[in-house]
């Protein structure tokens, strides 16, 4: 099974249509990877589905980088 980091990065590549090498931990979804607000909502939904978790809106707003997504998932896995 892949690590959480690998799974998060795979989802980001698929959702945003970016190259794997562009998805570095400190990359901002909007500033570095070209995501818009709809992309970020869809990305959060894909993360919720992949990791069978719920990301509250107030937390989703804080997930603006690849590392923030990884950190949230790691902190909220059962």
Curated annotation (Swiss-Prot):
Post-translational modification: 4'-phosphopantetheine is transferred from CoA to a specific serine of apo-ACP by AcpS. This modification is essential for activity because fatty acids are bound in thioester linkage to the sulfhydryl of the prosthetic group.
Domain Carrier: 2-77
SUPFAM superfamilies: ACP-like
GO molecular function, one term: acyl binding
InterPro entries linked: ACP, ACP-like_sf, PP-bd_ACP, Ppantetheine_attach_site
Gene3D superfamilies reported in the protein's UniProt record: ACP-like
Residues modified to O-(pantetheine 4'-phosphoryl)serine: 37
PANTHER family from the UniProt entry: ACYL CARRIER PROTEIN, CARRIER DOMAIN-CONTAINING PROTEIN
Pfam families according to UniProt: PP-binding
Family: Belongs to the acyl carrier protein (ACP) family.
Protein name (record): Acyl carrier protein
